[in-house]
Swiss-Prot record:
It comes from Gluconobacter oxydans (strain 621H). HAMAP family: Rib_5P_isom_A (MF_00170). Homodimer. Pfam families: Rib_5-P_isom_A. InterPro entries: NagB/RpiA_transferase-like, Ribose-5P_isomerase, Ribose5P_isomerase_typA_subgr, Ribose5P_isomerase_type_A. This is Ribose-5-phosphate isomerase A. NCBIfam families: PRK00702.1, rpiA. Keywords: Isomerase. One of its GO terms (biological process) is pentose-phosphate shunt, non-oxidative branch.
């Protein structure tokens, strides 16, 4: 399947997810290329009369939402989100556990997902795996102070490689919340809950990109249509 075909399928799934939104809802707006299609469709529906408020998971999503004409709000006004829609870098078959954060917004994405009554994830057919970590590293957001020490402790958790993320200019990547990201290559992860607990105990770690037991539904874009997966 070509990249163009894949984008067509992702757009179809993203628009289907956007059509789940109803007037009166507060919507978590994901980050990334797939989520961008969802934001585009929500903008069309707002222009047609849909009344919603969005909470974006990144500065980029905020910009896209404003350009699409979607009214925005924040957690000072709404503590709960009716539905959050986002992409993922890996989804584990069966459990629907996820790896997210290769787009650099994992902290805000996880805050929004946790606050959502329903968390819908959109992926293409290359993202499902039997075990998390088969293809994607686990992004770990860390504070910059002492990151070298934090990286050593992540390696001690079993990471085969720990690499600070850089931007296109080769400088250290900085998240919207002012932190760094260390991409940790663990390989296939047999016990993600245990690994998550180990990472959470490391001083300097802000958040990791394993979204465990959080997805309500996953829409998988395939050449034959959109598959709906539930835990």
């Amino acid at each position: 399947m070509s990249g163009t075909d894949m984008n067509v399928h992702k757009r179809t799934a993203a628009r289907e997810a956007a059509d789940m939104v109803k007037s009166g809802m507060v919507v978590g707006l994901g980050t990334g290329s797939t989520a961008a299609y969802m934001i585009e469709r929500l903008g069309e529906r707002v222009a047609e009369g849909l009344e919603i408020f969005g909470i974006p998971t990144s500065d980029d999503s905020e910009d896209k939402a404003l350009k699409a004409g979607i009214p925005l709000t924040d957690f000072s006004a709404h503590r709960r989100i009716d539905i959050a829609i986002d992409g993922a870098d890996e989804v584990q078959r069966g459990s629907l556990n996820l790896i997210k954060g290769l787009g650099g917004a994992l902290l805000r994405e996880k805050i929004v997902a946790q606050a959502a009554k329903r968390f819908v994830v959109i992926v293409d057919g290359t993202k499902p795996v039997d075990l998390l970590g088969e293809r994607a590293p686990v992004p770990v957001e860390v504070i910059s102070f002492g990151w070298e020490c934090t990286a050593e402790r992540l390696a001690a958790c079993g990471a085969r490689g720990v690499k600070p993320r850089t931007d296109r200019a080769g400088s250290l990547f900085v998240t919207d919340t002012g932190n760094m990201i260390l991409d940790c290559h663990f390989g296939p992860i047999e016990k993600p809950e245990e690994l998550a607990e180990k990472i959470d105990r490391i001083v300097g770690v802000v958040e990791h990109g394993m979204f465990l037991n959080m997805a309500s539904e996953v829409l998988v874009a395939t050449p034959d249509g959109v598959e709906h997966w539930e835990p």
